[in-house]
Amino acid sequence: MATSCFPPFSASSSSLCSSQFTPLLSCPRNTQICRKKRPVMASMHSENQKESNVCNRRSILFVGFSVLPLLNLRARALEGLSTDSQAQPQKEETEQTIQGSAGNPFVSLLNGLGVVGSGVLGSLYALARNEKAVSDATIESMKNKLKDKEDAFVSMKKQFESELLSEREDRNKLIRREGEERQALVNQLKSAKTTVISLGQELQNEKKLAEDLKFEIKGLQNDLMNTKEDKKKLQEELKEKLDLIQVLEEKITLLTTEIKDKEVSLRSNTSKLAEKESEVNSLSDMYQQSQDQLMNLTSEIKELKDEIQKRERELELKCVSEDNLNVQLNSLLLERDESKKELHAIQKEYSEFKSNSDEKVASDATLGEQEKRLHQLEEQLGTALSEASKNEVLIADLTREKENLRRMVDAELDNVNKLKQEIEVTQESLENSRSEVSDITVQLEQLRDLSSKLEREVSKLQMELEETRASLQRNIDETKHSSELLAAELTTTKELLKKTNEEMHTMSDELVAVSENRDSLQTELVNVYKKREHTRNELKQEKTIVRTLEEELKFLESQITREKELRKSLEDELEKATESLDEINRNVLALAEELELATSRNSSLEDEREVHRQSVSEQKQISQEAQENLEDAHSLVMKLGKERESLEKRAKKLEDEMAAAKGEILRLRSQINSVKAPVEDEEKVVAGEKEKVNVQQ
């Protein structure tokens, strides 16, 4: 591509290009970097000038590749100029001036290439400059880090050297101290040699003292064992007394709970009694109401009886009217039969009238009479129908009255059933009240028994409390005496310990004096060391024994303080027990008063119960009478119902007969109408013939 595009290039052109691009490379954008790299660049130019020419050629080729799209753009612009030559003369002039000034197209191309290459190289140079700046910054940071590490390494060296020096000094000091300690140990050995002989004699004396102390310790141990046994006995006695007190407290709590339960039961019984009184009052009210209702029912029954009598009378009158109606119906039926016979006769006469037209005039008179008779029959039928409608109205009224009476009787029966139920409820409530009163009496008897038992138990508890008080006071006196003895023994043991300590101090002083006077016994050091260790062990054992004795004494003192505290607590508990007993006595007195009140209430309740029994017996008698009256009324009502049913049957029969009569009347009317139509036609024919005869005349 490069050879085809640029064939005439030679060394002169390459020199021109190099002369044109040198100022671009020598632009003062990064003078420091150029200064740093001047010797490197000089060496490179001096070594290989051919490589620089090759680089220039390569740069020209790259610029040519980058300019190719610009040439295409210029060709497109020239095509646009050929199309718009008439509209843009000024642009052509400018192009001509540019072509005239250029003279040679290769020079213009080179200028364009130089401009484009300068832009590309400038951008590449800027990128390289930024990369160099970043690399310089990283190098400087690395140099700073290296300097810091070197400083840290130097400081570590100095610290290590100082530590080594200090360790050497410490080792020297330790060596000196060890030498001094060795010398001190040698001196101690020398002094120990002098003290060993004196220790032998002192050990013998100390053994004697230790044996004496052992005998004294054994005696003290025996005394301590005796005191421990006495203390155990006292503790057992205290436990027994505490158990007794707990048992008494439990009994007291049980008694208090029982008393509270009895109080609650008394309250509940009183509330139940109040409820029963209210129930009795309500029952008395119900009884009075039932009496009033019975009076009202008796009055209503009387009224019903009067109404029944009235209705019976009305029914008798209605039966009479029904008999009259039956008679009238029979008469109407007879008249109907006669009218039927007359109709048959009229039909026969009509047939004869047809056969005998000459006898029409005579038949007209008979027809008029028959018509009059028919009108009379129609009037009679109308009256019969009106009477039948009246009878129907009466029957409907009677049925309504019958239904009303049935409703009244049903309501009365419901009221009677309700009264029976109320009476049964009252009887059940009275029986329940009786059973509850009997239960209350049983409970009161139980309460009396419990109160007597409580009084007995309270008296027993008082006796037991007095005995426990006496025994506790004895135990307290014994514990006081034993504590005083223990305190005296403790004082004696403390004095003995002080004496032994003083003797030990004197012996130690004498041992020091003997150790200063005797320095010639070096050969017996080993034996003396053994003896000294043995004596040390014995002394340690004696010290441990003394410490145990002191600890036991402290423990005894603490036990004495505890026993004092227990004594105080027992005294407080005794005071509380006495207070609780006083409260129990008060509660017992209050319960006795409440029992007396309950007995009085029971007596009053029994009186009231007897009164209620009498009232209930009276109510039963009244209810029996009311039941008998109700049964009588029920029997009367049943009789009335049967009579009503018979009347209803009769009314139904009358209705059926009336319906049959209506049907027959309608048939008669239809027959009469059928007879009237041909008669009227014949009359019209006769009238027409008469008119014709008159016209002919």
Curated annotation (Swiss-Prot):
Residues of the transit peptide: 1-41, 42-79
GO biological process, one term: starch biosynthetic process
Segments on the Lumenal, thylakoid side according to the record's topology features: 80-106
Molecular-function GO terms, alphabetical: DNA binding
UniProt keyword annotations, A-Z: Chloroplast, Coiled coil, DNA-binding, Membrane, Nucleus, Plastid, Starch biosynthesis, Thylakoid, Transit peptide, Transmembrane, Transmembrane helix
One cellular component (GO) term of this entry: nuclear matrix
Localization (cell): Plastid, Chloroplast; Plastid, Chloroplast thylakoid membrane; Plastid, Chloroplast stroma, Chloroplast nucleoid; Nucleus
Membrane spanning residue stretches: 107-127
Domain notes per entry: The C-terminal part (439-697) is necessary for DNA-binding.
Protein name: MAR-binding filament-like protein 1
UniProt source species: Solanum lycopersicum (Tomato)
Gene this protein is translated from: MFP1
